[in-house]
Amino acid sequence: MGISLDNGIRISLSDIFEGDQEHAFATTLHPDGRHEIVDVEPLAEGSTSIWNSATTGRRYPTKWVVSIPMLKARLCVEPFVREQEVVSPIGEHKYEGASSVIGQMQGEPVTGHAIVELVGDWN
């Protein structure tokens, strides 16, 4: 998930599964050029609003609450349109959702936009 906030902060989120282990982290780029890698609460736990693809039968979450404790951030990510699956005739189908972001960071309201990419089985 890539997030661009109106306060100038850019966030790249990763949520990786290895067996039954989930590893979530974010790389942040601040307007002054500072770069940080910080822990994120697991994204799968904050995902809701499951959309079922009529084309592939895949299920994808389409709303997320992103919590980044070190940045004192809680961001709600929701797609502009739910149906944003990329169907591949030769490979893995995936969800690439252009989304809006609204929330709080460091006690201040923030808004922005995001692109969400989901690969794999979300059943």
Labelled PLM ranges:
Residues 1-123:
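Structured soluble/peripheral alpha/beta segments that form catalytic or ligand/cofactor-binding pockets
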